[in-house]
Each structure stands twice: as structure tokens, then as C-alpha cells.
Amino acid sequence: MSFVPGQENAGSRSSSGNRAGNGILKKTTWADQTERGQNNGNRGRRNQPKQTATTQPNTGSVVPHYSWFSGITQFQKGKEFQFAGGQGVPIANGIPPSEQKGYWYRHNRRSFKTPDGQQKQLLPRWYFYYLGTGPHAGASFGDSIEGVFWVANSQADTNTSADIVERDPSSHEAIPTRFAPGTVLPQGFYVEGSGRSAPASRSGSRSQSRGPNNRARSSSNQRQPASTVKPDMAEEIAALVLAKLGKDAGQPKQVTKQSAKEVRQKILNKPRQKRTPNKQCPVQQCFGKRGPNQNFGGPEMLKLGTSDPQFPILAELAPTPGAFFFGSKLELVKKNSGGVDEPTKDVYELQYSGAVRFDSTLPGFETIMKVLNENLNAYQNQAGGADVVSPKPQRKRGTKQTAQKEELDSISVAKPKSAVQRNVSRELTPEDRSLLAQILDDGVVPDGLDDSNV
């Protein structure tokens, strides 16, 4: 019994036009229509015989035979089509492992002319054929053939042909190519999808079945390729990839002083209860200094605000708007308006008090308690009372010189002695005594006179 890919029972096939045995309209793939596209406008003429591998023109515009599966298209030049051993056979319902053997056939596609007049060759597309079918039906498994890559399941017997029927595109559509888990697709290739032309296929078939009066209308609904590949698809894919990489892999946006100022001003323009402090607009700029009435926040959290890594777990304790209004004690208080020169306006405060209750079963309880203990009344542990974040100390001019002067003044330096003091130890000579006697009124110089009494 011959096997039919995609069907459990091979005997259920039908050849009734474009409908399968179950009466469902079947669509065809791009490979099917490429071969028949040349005869679309030749109604009433005798159909041309199907071209085979030996009669295929070098232009590559015709796909010989009909593969059971959608193709694999190359989109990067210089890549080699290959599968690892035991891989590469498309899977389909109804095909036992013993029949999973065959080859991938390279179809050289047509060339096209670019807007500047140059000829450009489309990269090839590969189609799978079971062993004993397709353009190389008479070849043995493993024969060295240009443009053929052999694949087989580890349980398949490659010495015999696969018992698989040829595909009739009028009865069976091409199956989307799928591989067994773990199969590595060749680099630089992608699997052609199928089914994208199903609406056009059905509308085209319906319009053709309405009679000759609708043939002109049906010409605009001709079935389109199931997988339309633009000539420059490889370039487009590369451009998209580069654009994506350029977006994601670019340098991080730098925050300048100007941008930080704009962010801060944008936050401060909001009502007080709508502000969200962050690095650009710290807590004290949003809500003021810490003190008895605003007693939460340590130095690190006051700098980072909600950007602090510990803040998200605290946010789990924050009440919802519903809990705020319905679970708190609210009081509306009218406040005095501005100064005398300011326009008169009514100012109110919605004062509230409440509590958030939690216990040790709360996820992250220990971390929450640690963060709360570090930030509650943290201003009391800082020098300067309510000023938790101490301002940057200003450098006073002349401080260094003043300190040096004070240091010099604190050092006691002995003053040099006079000439008389330096001679205290010298004995008086008789000449000195005579001279002193003349000076003194009484003319007597005591014997005990020394330089210390002079």
C-alpha cells in the first residue's frame, strides 16, 4: 500500500478537480502555480507537457515535479545547505519512520532586473522529494549529484525506494515543512510558510466556477503565491535586523543637567499628592525636609526616591485609592488663603489618618521590617535634626591661611637677649668699678654688685 503524506488512509484520495476526497477545496502552493502560470492566459489551447529535471531551462523559472512540502529558501549568500545525520526529513502524518528518506533538491530561481538595469539572481530554494520520486527518481541514496542533499531517518532503509505516491496538486496541497524536535535548520535559510494565499485561492476558484461572464472579474482574483518572496528580501531582512540591533544595542541615553532639570520641573509642576520622587527630583524637593510630620526616609532612600531598590517591596504596603478613601479617617479643613497682595482663593486640606495592618505571613516580611526600621524616624539619627541630607560643606576663603597663622601664634618663641643680658656672667674689672664710682654720688660700689642689679 502506498502512503500519502498528511493522511492516515491512503485510499481516501480523490481526483475530482480541486477538491479532496472529503469535498474540501484544496489550495495550491507557489511551486504548483509557477509551473501552470504560463498557461493561465491560453484557455482552449493544448496544455504544454510538464517539464522534468532534464528539460528544465537554465533560467530556473519552473519547479520540476511537485514536492509534498513547502520549500526552504536561502536568504544569505555563501551559506551551505546541510543537515546533521538522521535529520532533515520533513514530518507528516501517515508516513512511518521506515519511509522517511529522500533528498532535498535545489531549485535555481529566476533572475530579475533592478531599477538601475542590472540583472540580479534570486537565491535558490530547496524542495524535498522522497527516495524514488521527483526529478531524480532513478538515483540511489547517496549518489553524488549537483544540487542534491540526501537525508534519511535513522530507522529508514535507504536501499529501497520510499513507497510514497506522487503529489497531484489538484487533489493535495503542499504540507508546511516541519521537522522533528532537535533538528537544526541550516544557517542562512528559512522555511517557506503555506496557507497565506488560501483566501485568494478560494475566491479565485469560486469566480472561475461562476461561468464565462465572470472570467474578466476572476482575472483580478487569480491565486497568488502562497509565499511571496521579494527579490531583495535578503537585503530587507538584513536592514530590519540592523535597525533592530541599532535600536536595542545603542548607547544608553545620557541624562544631562538640562534634561534632569526638565524632569524635575515636570514633577514639581504636579500637585503634591501626585508627585513621584526619583533621582532627578529627590524626596526633599518633592515633599520637604524630614521631621516629626514627615518622618520616613533614610539618606539613601531620600536621594533615590522610588528608584531605590528597596522601595518596590514597601509599595506593597501602600493602600489603594479605594482603601485610602474608605479605610481612613478623613477630615476636610479650610486653610487660610495667601497674603494680602495675593488673590483671594479658598484653600482646603483633606486630612487623613489610618493604618496598614500586616503580619509575619506577608511575603518578604523580614525585609519589610528591616527597611522600615532603617527609614522610620531616620532624621533623628542624623546630625542637624530634621536636615537628614546635610548640605555640601562650603569652602571658606582664607581658612587655610588663618589656621596656619593661629598655629604659629600658639608656638612660644624665646626672644633674643640684649647685649647686657648676654654679659651677665662677666666679672667687673677695676676699670669698671672706677667708672661706676664716678657715676654714683657716694662713690662707693658695693662688692655684691653684679650685672643683675644694674
From Swiss-Prot:
Biased segments, Low complexity type: 9-23, 193-212
Positions of modified residues (Phosphothreonine): T177, T429
Record bears the keyword Transcription: yes
Superkingdom of the source species: Viruses
Keyword line: ADP-ribosylation, Host Golgi apparatus, Phosphoprotein, Ribonucleoprotein, RNA-binding, Transcription, Transcription regulation, Viral nucleoprotein, Virion
Annotated Pfam families: CoV_nucleocap
Positions carrying Phosphoserine: S170, S194, S390, S425
Keyword Transcription among record annotations: yes
Dimerization, as annotated region: 267-384
Compositionally skewed regions (Polar residues) per UniProt: 49-61, 215-227
Location relative to the cell: Virion; Host endoplasmic reticulum-Golgi intermediate compartment; Host Golgi apparatus
Main subcellular localisation: virion
CoV N CTD domain sequence ranges: 260-383
PTM annotation, UniProt: ADP-ribosylated. The ADP-ribosylation is retained in the virion during infection.
Spans annotated as Disordered: 1-62, 186-230, 271-290, 383-428
Residue positions binding RNA: R109, R125, R167
CDD domains, per database record: CoV_N-CTD, CoV_N-NTD
Any one Gene Ontology cellular component term annotated for this protein: host cell endoplasmic reticulum-Golgi intermediate compartment
Function of the protein: Packages the positive strand viral genome RNA into a helical ribonucleocapsid (RNP) and plays a fundamental role during virion assembly through its interactions with the viral genome and membrane protein M. Plays an important role in enhancing the efficiency of subgenomic viral RNA transcription as well as viral replication.
Subunit architecture: Homooligomer. Both monomeric and oligomeric forms interact with RNA. Interacts with protein M. Interacts with NSP3; this interaction serves to tether the genome to the newly translated replicase-transcriptase complex at a very early stage of infection.
Family membership: Belongs to the betacoronavirus nucleocapsid protein family.
HAMAP family the record matches: BETA_CORONA_NCAP (MF_04096)
Name of protein: Nucleoprotein
Organism: Rat coronavirus (strain 681)
